[in-house]
Amino acid sequence: MRNLLLDQYATADIDQFVGKVLSDLGNPNPPLKLAEVRELLRLGKAFYSSTHDSAIREVAHKLKVAGQPVLARPTILKDIIGKLGLKALLLPDRRRILIDSEVPGQKQRWSEAHQIGHDVIPWHADTMLGDNKSTLTPACHEQIEAEANYAAGQLLFLQDRFLEEARSLSPNLDSVKVLTDRYQNTITTTLWRYVELNPGLAVGAISGHPHRPAVDFSPRNPLRYFIRSRAFSGRFSGVTEADIYAGIQTYCDDRAGGLLGRGEVRLFDNSGQSHVFQFETFFNRYEALTLGSYLRPSHAAVPV
């Protein structure tokens, strides 16, 4: 799945909303304390278990959605959580974020920030759970989720501060790991931001092990996520997931974990010209994370 790149008008508005939150917090240093963000926005937090009906019903007894008691529709939370695969949800009427307790600790941080993102974007109010006035098309839903993801990333990575620090480091996975520790976010979300906010030609991928495919692996959709910088998306719009995955397989070793390898991968731009990218892939025993950084045109001479 490709990352959806928002237009400049949406990002400018969201940057303004997030900037006000960070300013009101005194422009904190990393890592951002989400408890302080919730206190500022007067948001509460509670947990539910997606694997226990009784836990969902216990939460439902206490909540209202769009002004109506959830208890009047006792299966609403269970149905929504199950059908949509939700890991967290925002209940605006109650000023409450609900998080699935089954989600691993560090991933809960992203789920919480995503819901805060929905809360700080004013036009998301009419699309929240239970509002019968707004029925979202799949494309609109994708847009809304991308906007909340962008807001979450701008919060957790403190807007321009992350970009400035990323620029000061070498373009490799070691730098991504440094930023992961500094901002206390998952390496997956850090890689995503590192690539997506890169002003140059950068590409990232999150996939299974390139030499140990899962039972449900699809050659047509080999990547879990295909992340592109805005510059890469514009100049290399014809590059597919299959192209990236094929390149990854050329240099990766069949190791159980850690660095799987580095190598040069050739990709074709929109005019058909070949260019060389430096790729490297790390496997954390759950997913393979790949970063590709631009090196040179294929015909350029290599310094000796």
Language-model segments: residues:
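Active-site hotspot residues in diverse enzymes, especially metal/ion-binding acidic/histidine motifs
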Residues: 1-304
